Amino acid sequence: MTWARRNRQNNNWYYIQQRERAMIYKQVICKDGFRMSVQAGENLSSIPRQNSVERYEAVEIGYPSEKESLILEYAEGPNDPTDTVYAYVPVHIVTLVIAKHGGMVSGEVPPGVIVLPA
């Protein structure tokens, strides 16, 4: 959002850009107990790297509760798969992970990830 403000001393206008806040999505919990954080936004490993977009193509997964073979290739620290971030994971892969674990019981995902309820 951009808006203008007038400087009182010299009567000139200047523009202030207010950044949209990043949404923090609640941890995804699947039917079989599998858990993971799924986030997207300006300072995260997502496509696009912007806040509040209509649809993301790739998102960041963090700290899954167990090793998950579908996302291993995206791991930043593959030696400890439950204590790392998974960068630029395509949204269709996230949907497959949720489906593999029986669907989503609770949590939130960024726009673009298809929610499959348990």
Language-model features, listed with the residues they occupy:
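Low-complexity intrinsically disordered segments
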Residues: E68-A118
